[in-house]
UniProtKB/Swiss-Prot annotation:
Presence of keyword Ion transport: no
GO BP terms: defense response to virus; immune system process; positive regulation of DNA-templated transcription; positive regulation of type I interferon production; regulation of transcription by RNA polymerase II; toll-like receptor signaling pathway; TRIF-dependent toll-like receptor signaling pathway
GO molecular function, one term: DNA-binding transcription factor activity, RNA polymerase II-specific
UniProt tissue specificity: Widely expressed with higher expression in lung, spleen and intestine.
Protein name per UniProt: Interferon regulatory factor 3
Gene name per UniProt: IRF3
Protein family according to the UniProt entry: Belongs to the IRF family.
Record-linked PROSITE patterns: IRF_1, IRF_2
InterPro entries: Interferon_reg_fac_CS (IPR019817), Interferon_reg_fact_DNA-bd_dom (IPR001346), Interferon_reg_factor-3 (IPR019471), SMAD-like_dom_sf (IPR017855), SMAD_FHA_dom_sf (IPR008984), WH-like_DNA-bd_sf (IPR036388), WH_DNA-bd_sf (IPR036390)
Organism, scientific name: Gallus gallus (Chicken)
């Protein structure tokens, strides 16, 4: 397949104009405009671990690798091409994700729109019109809402911060630094009485990337008050009968790391001190995605070991911090959803920090925050993991992840390790309501974990229950060699 003429001028090339040119060129199968104004386009996005991957499925990623000067002709590395492409796509301000259908079996792809004010290949810079259909109305269970005090009067929020410039080289350099190979007054309340959404609604693609809603919304007024933080949790709320304050679930307690796991965060040779914040040598790359009732409203990749999620940038509680700002809910179509979301955002604040091989969270304000790993929300009663105010809590341990990833590679573990964390603001997770029904949901994905998980999949590991999968990984996959070598030295 012919490549674009601009490939080769890597030093002067910018990703945004290059991608627009590629979409218009018609050279890449599945990469095309899908609206007459040429503001919305689709990108083929088949997972590298699928058996039916062909060269045409990765052609656009390979083309950018060549254009950006990252292509090595003697080694075909589709996963690396795709990672480079994804990092470039996220770091530019020119595009926004409309639909993620990468999990679709027949035609995996993603749909992007050219951001307002950015000219397309025809020079038009008008806004994207009609790309997103109106969102379904609010599904709200008043028992789920959790505030310590009555929210104050709402004010309009501030636009979210711009995406940060992230490059794969940062990940590569940190991995090399660790001697790890990169190769290898209560308002009137309402509750919905119609059909509940499916548990996996967030994963089901709709025509506009939003949640499929019921045909008819039936609302009824509720007499019971909003659940406050100083009230006991009854059977109708988030806890058990007669329960008081929500304890952190003991099921989710992280065991103490073994000496071999500790070694994952130490260089075999003396190394300079870790960067500020002491993240244990791990790259501080964290994908943060914000959803308002199942609809993605913001996404950012934070390259700092510390950040604060907040709504008001001038809030003294978050002064002089790296901010990830919640978008204003003013554009939400449902007035009840808009009001409740605004009330929660006014009293929401959370600090995240990667330190000593862990991801730590501290609630800063009145809005309660519950957290869970994605697999804990797939069936049964989810854990009642509550972040207490001004108390630092470990919500993810990278050492546990590395141990589980090794076991997954060696077929000692059927399921892949879980590295996706969900945070729910003002509502607790429930087995009867999907997470997509929550007013404010935040998804966290550490890039370190995603990168190494993809490396294992490239080596042949699969989360399918295959039973007798033979895993043959390259000798250069030093993450696990490091563990095994340490075991040999200490036995």
């Amino acid at each position: 397949m012919a490549a674009l003429d601009s490939e080769g001028d890597a030093q002067k090339l910018r990703f945004g104009p290059w991608l627009l040119n590629a979409v218009s060129s018609g050279l890449y199968r599945g990469l095309c405009w899908i609206d007459p104004d040429r503001r919305i386009f689709r990108i083929p996005w088949k997972h590298n671990a699928r058996k039916d991957v062909t060269s045409s499925d990765v052609e656009i990623f390979k083309a950018w690798a060549k254009a950006s000067g990252r292509y090595e002709g003697n080694a075909e590395d589709p996963a690396k091409w795709k990672t480079n492409f994804r990092c470039a796509l996220r770091s530019t301000h020119m595009f926004m994700l409309l639909e993620d259908r990468s999990k679709c079996n027949d035609d995996p792809h993603k749909v992007y729109a050219v951001a307002s004010g950015v000219p397309n290949d025809r020079g038009s810079g008008g806004p994207v019109a009609g790309a997103l259909q109106q969102q379904p109305q609010l599904l709200l269970n008043h028992h789920d809402l959790a505030l310590e005090n009555t929210p104050t009067d709402s004010t309009e929020g501030v636009a979210a911060a711009a995406l940060t410039q992230v490059d794969l080289d940062l990940l590569q350099s940190v991995l090399q630094h660790c001697n790890i190979s990169a190769l290898g007054s209560q308002p009137t309340l309402w509750a919905h009485t119609g059909d509940a959404l499916p548990e996996d609604a967030l994963l089901l693609p709709g025509q506009d990337g939003c949640l499929p809603g019921p045909q008819f919304q039936d609302w009824r007024q509720l007499e019971e008050p909003l659940l406050l933080g100083n009230q006991p949790l009854t059977g109708g709320g988030c806890g058990q009968d007669g329960a008081g304050a929500l304890p952190v679930s003991e099921e989710c307690a992280i065991p103490a790391p073994s000496p071999a796991e500790e070694l994952l965060f130490q260089s075999a040779n003396p190394a300079p001190p870790p960067p500020a914040g002491d993240i244990g040598g791990l790259p501080p790359l964290l994908d943060i995605t914000i959803y308002y009732r199942g609809k993605m409203v913001y996404q950012e990749q934070v390259d700092d070991s510390r950040c604060v999620l907040a709504y008001q940038p001038l809030d003294p509680a978050v002064a002089e911090q790296r901010l990830v700002l919640f978008p204003s809910p003013a554009s939400l179509p449902d007035p009840r959803q808009r009001r409740y979301t605004e009330d929660l955002l006014e009293v929401a604040g959370l600090r995240l920090e990667q330190r000593a091989g862990q991801l730590l969270a501290t609630r800063l304000k009145k809005c309660k925050v519950f957290w869970a790993l994605s697999q804990q929300l797939e069936g049964g009663e989810p854990p009642l993991n509550l972040l207490h105010r001004d108390q630092e809590t470990t919500i993810f341990d990278f050492r546990v992840f590395c141990t589980e990833l090794r076991d997954f590679r060696d077929s000692r573990r059927e399921r892949s390790p879980d590295f996706t964390i969900f945070l729910c603001f003002g509502q607790c997770f429930s087995s009867t309501k999907p997470k997509e029904s929550k007013l404010i949901l935040v998804k966290l994905v550490p890039q370190f974990c995603e990168y190494w998980y993809e490396q294992v999949q490239r080596g042949g590991a699969s989360s399918l229950n295959s039973g007798n999968v033979s895993l043959q990984l390259s000798d250069s996959f030093n993450l696990f060699e490091l563990i095994e070598q340490y075991h040999m030295q200490t036995d």
